[in-house]
Amino acid sequence: MDGDSPDIEEVFNLAEKFGAGVMVDEAHGTGLTGENNLGQAQQFINHPNCVAIIYPLGKSAGLSGAFVVGSKMLKQYLINFSRSFIYTTGPSKQLVIQLR
C-alpha cells in the first residue's frame, strides 16, 4: 500500500454511465480525507449509484467492528441476510463511547 486513492468522482461517473452500483470501503480514508474527515465517498452518499459506504473501525479509528451507510432497502437486507450481523453480539458500551 502506498497511499494511492482513486478519482472517486470518475468512479461514480462511470457507474452512472454503465448503470452500475458503487460500494466504497473507507478503511483508510476515514479521519484523513474528505469533507469533515469522513472519507472520500461521503460527498456521494446521496448519489443514485451509491449502494453503500463501509466504514471499518479497525484501521484509522483504532477500534473494532464496522458500520455500513446505505439505503433503507440495504439496511433491511443486511438485517435479514447478513450472517455476520445476525450471529454476533452488539458492540460493548465502551466501544460505543469511544466511537462517539
Each language-model region and where it sits:
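Active-site core of PLP-dependent enzymes with the aminotransferase class I/II
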Residues: 1-18
